Structure formats: structure tokens, C-alpha cells
Amino acid sequence: MYYKSAIIVRFNMDSCIQKKQVWYKHLSPRQWKIFGAAWTGYLLDGFDFVLISLVLTEVQHEFGLTTIEAASLISAAFISRWFGGLAIGALSDKMGRRMAMVLSIVLFSLGTLACGLAPGYAVMFIARIVIGLGMAGEYGSSVTYVIESWPVHLRNKASGFLISGFSIGGGLAAQVYSIVVPLWGWRSLFFVGMLPILFAFYLRKNLPESDDWQKRQQENKPVRTMVDILYREKNKYINILLSCIAFACLYVCFSGVTANAALITVMALCCAAVFISFIYQGMGKRWPTGIMLMLVVMFCFLYGWPLQAFLPTWLKVDMQYSPETVALIFMLAGFGSAAGSCIGGFMGDWLGTRKAYVISLLIGQLVIIPVFLVDRDYVWLLGLLIFTQQVFGQGIGALVPKIISGYFNVEQRAAGLGFIYNVGSLGGACAPILGAVVASHTSLGTAMCSLAFILTFVVLVLIGFDMPSRVQRWIHPEAALEYDTVDGKPFYGARKKNVAEE
């Protein structure tokens, strides 16, 4: 007992010393190299993903698409993300984070090239599905790669800094759009977007593995991933069939092949049942935690993506700005989100993850309505408001990976994070279509504003009250985790450490 008490005291003393030192002095050149590679991968991921939003009106005009069909091209990438997160995440858990990152970059680069070559709507829709597979894999593998390599007390910063790369990639894409598209047309933008594949070869040759993953491998224990549980054990044939059903249902929901609300509702419920079944099989008695985490991510996408997906269209059509002005404001939004990601990382390590999340979202709520009240002549004021809203309303979402990671052990972290996050990201697939439906009854600006404002409050409740831990304790308290596996902070309802008990 005395020995364990000494360890706890020493840990607390070390934590106090760490907080007094400048944070970046705790990082080695190797850890910075790992971060730089993962951050660049995220930047390229963000660059490729937002290209369709920038040229959506041009694609819609050339292919003769309806607004719903055009919006489905944004949603298509989300249809496959759940499987990409699961499969590539499991590969990351078993074979290493680096290999998964390389495969992910190759997939979304090839999908981007296919978008530029697409002769029509169907081919572009399929190409966007391939982009979704790669994007999901990049997300899960890069996040776990950096979080597992950085010191425990800096892991909010690790998450926040990393996700900023996605937003900066979007802002960079906006600038490339303003230069390339007026000269060579919208297809040329996608050809530029295939360049990340060169970066994949650098990653394959020059990066080490994450610290936590290497330690886990040294234990020589068999790794039982979610892919093993779902597709290699007794229910494998049923789960393969369920996966096919999920893909088919998602296609019906998001391809625009039907506008029958009842049919779409039935398909959505079938998908929900499949994913809940997978969570139940993969997490056992901890399925309430998995479902609540999925809802957290879903509502994060629902409140944020209508604004991100339709911002270029709103600026071009409703505000009637030139391509150069659209690119400038979209760049400000991207860099606002990136700055917010970094600020969120500092806030998370300072105040705690959940408290930082709530405070940041409340500030963002104060700004969202004024964004849509500004007259079109006040371009810089509009840009400043959008920048501020993205800093506090969108940027704080960079802490979501850290939140989810804390509910999984190392051997299932990448697949768990990848699957939960990317199933929840279907909220991003719903968001553009939901925005288009609401906009059909009102203006696009009103639809974007109302959805963002209302749905943000749902996220405030889910994260602010730690609903994953609460619901877990209501249903299966014996399976509840006491402490975050990433930073050791207590979850809701955790017992205080009692040295005498230990």
C-alpha cells in the first residue's frame, strides 16, 4: 500500500512539474515528425474532400442535376465511411498505424482523380464513395497515431492541432479553386487533388510506429479487432449480409433515386439496426457507450455540415459574390476552424475536455445568427463573423477524436474510433440533404442558420453531461469505465481512487 501511495504522489508531483514547463519542450523530434506527417495527411484529406463543395454549382450545371442530386454528391462520401473506418481501422490495430495511413491516402487520391474524369453523375457518385473509404481510414489511423505518440498531458493539443490540418486543407483548396477553375474548368481542380498520392510513398518509407501500438505488440498477445469479431467468427455470414443491406439502404437514402419519405425512413431505420447490431457485437456490455458516442458524432456533423457544405453555394447564389470573394470567405472559414482546433486543444488541456467543449460552443452560438444578417456590401464584416463562428463553433470539434479514443483500449482503438466516428458521420451525409429540404421551404441562409443553432444545443447536452458514461451506468454499470484510457481523467460517476482498496 505504501508503494502504491508513493507512485500516486510521484505521479501528481510529475504532473505539477509538467504543467509549469512550456508544453512543446516535452516533445521529442521524433514526436514532432510523427505529428507533421499525420497533420500533412489530414491537410491533404481536407483538400480533396471539399473540392466537390467548391465546384458543386458547376457540376450541377454540366450534368443537369437537381439540388437534391447535387447534394447527394457531398453525401456519397459518407455512405462508405462507416466501412472504411471499420476495415482500415482494424488493419491499423493489427498491422500498424503507418500502413493504414498510406492505404487511406492512396484511396482518396484515386477517388479524386476519378471525379475529374467522371463523364456523368453515376461515376462521380461512385468516386465519392471511394473518397469516403480513404477519408475514414485516414481519420482513424492518423488520430490514433498522434494521440498514442504524444505525452498524456498534451493529448487534447495533439487532437486539436491534428484536426486543424483538415480545415487548412479546405482553405487551401479554396485558393487553388480561385486560380485553377477560371482558367481550366472544374475538372482541373480534381486533377490537382490527386497529388497526395506522392506523399503516401514518403510515409511508407520514413515514419516509425506509434509508442502505444509498439508497446502493445511487444506483449505478443493476439489482437482481436472488430473485423475479426464481425466477419471471421460465428456470425460472419449474417454480418456480411447485413453490411450489404446497410450499403444498399444508404444508397437509396442518399443517391436521390427516390423522394419517397416513407421509404427513406424505413431504409434509415434498417441502417440504424445494422449499426447497433455491430456495436452490440463489437463492444459487448459496453454497447450503450458505443451508441451514445455515435449520437455525439452524428449531432456534431448535423450542426456543422449544413454550413460547411452550402457556404460556397450561399455566397455565390444568395449573396452573389465573385469567385474570388467566395474563395476569400471560404478560406477565412477554413482557417477559423483550424485556429479553433488549436485553441480547443489548449482549452481542453487547461479546463478539461468537456468543459472546454461547452464554453466554446456557447460562444459560437452568439455569432451564428449575425452571420446571416449582414448586408452583402460588408464583405469583411461577414468574413470576420464567419471566421469567429468557425473558431468557436466548429473548431472545438477537433476534440471529438480524443473524446472517443478515451473509451477504447489500444488494441481496439483505431477500429473503435474509426467505426463509431464514421457511423456518426452519417449525420454529415444527412446534413446537406436536410439543409436542401429545409431550404426548399425557406431561404438557404435561414436553413443553414436554424439547423446550426438548434442542433448545437443537442451536442451541448450530450457532451456537457457526459451522456455516454451516464447511459452506460444506467444500463450496464458493471461494464462502465472509470477513467479515460487516453488521459486518465475520471468519467461521470467514477469512484475516487482509494489507495487502501488498491
UniProtKB/Swiss-Prot annotation:
GO CC terms of this entry: plasma membrane
Membrane topology per record: Multi-pass membrane protein
Gene Ontology molecular functions: carboxylic acid transmembrane transporter activity; sialic acid:proton symporter activity
Superkingdom as given in the UniProt entry: Bacteria
Pfam families named in the record: MFS_1
Bilayer-spanning residue ranges: 34-54, 71-91, 105-125, 129-149, 158-178, 179-199, 237-257, 259-279, 291-311, 326-346, 367-387, 391-411, 419-439, 445-465
Disulfide bonds: none
Major localization class: membrane
Stored NCBIfam families: PRK03893.1
Protein function: Catalyzes the proton-dependent transport of sialic acid.
UniProt similarity note: Belongs to the major facilitator superfamily. Sialate:H(+) symporter (SHS) (TC 2.A.1.12) family.
Protein name: Sialic acid transporter NanT 2
Source organism of this protein record: Escherichia coli O6:H1 (strain CFT073 / ATCC 700928 / UPEC)
